[in-house]
Amino acid sequence: MKFLFVLSALASLAAAQSVVIQAPAPGTTFAPGQQFVVDVDRPDTITGSQDVSVAIGLLSCVGQAPPGTCDGVNTTEEIGTVLFAGPYTPQLRPGGADLFQNFTVSVPDGFQAGAAALSVAHFTLVGELAMPVLEVITETVFVS
Ligand SMILES: *[C@@H]1O[C@H](CO)[C@@H](O)[C@H](O)[C@H]1NC(C)=O
Ligand SMILES: *[C@@H]1O[C@H](CO)[C@@H](O)[C@H](O)[C@H]1NC(C)=O
């Protein structure tokens, strides 16, 4: 019983550490070679958690999903071309209540035109027990 409680408490704790892609907006169109900022946000929670790293990937959905969509593409299995992989050390947003970090990345030259899944894989250690949590969040963007 107690164990179950601890597990569910950890699960909600883990959910509270979840990141969001603040920018770019879903549906944004980029040209191959174009630079853009991926703004990775998380709430400034009082519960202890230690962010470790993120990986940002871009996966073409062309031929894997109905045209113009990424429906059914599972980015927990692959994030595609890795645009960034390294430490995640978010800072308090000026004038805001959340933590953020901007990553400047570029669409690879010659990237397949069409819908693409932009993913952020986020690795964090949650709570006093340092429970390792890996989450992958994704949005659909377009490459022209
Ligand atoms: C995505 O893939 C993972 C790992 O294979 C699997 O656990 C999960 O159920 C899949 N999700 C969907 C929506 O298919
Ligand atoms: C981070 O990126 C967002 C979205 O592009 C932008 O509004 C903000 O000014 C950037 N912040 C910094 C400090 O570069």
Regions found by a protein language model. Give the residues of each.
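N-terminal edge beta-strand
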Residues: 15-41
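A cross-taxa feature marking solvent-exposed loop/turn segments within ectodomains of secreted
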Residues: 17, 47-49, 111-113
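Fungal secretory targeting signals
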Residues: 1-20
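Interdomain boundary/hinge segments at the C-termini of tandem beta-sandwich modules
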Residues: 141-143
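Internal, hydrophobic beta-strand segments that form the core of beta-sheet-rich folds
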Residues: 99-139
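Exposed beta-strand and adjacent loop surfaces of beta-rich binding modules
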Residues: 18, 51-53, 138
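Contiguous segments within soluble domain cores/interaction surfaces
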Residues: 35, 43-92, 121-122, 133-134
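Short structured motifs
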Residues: 21-26, 85-90, 102-106, 137
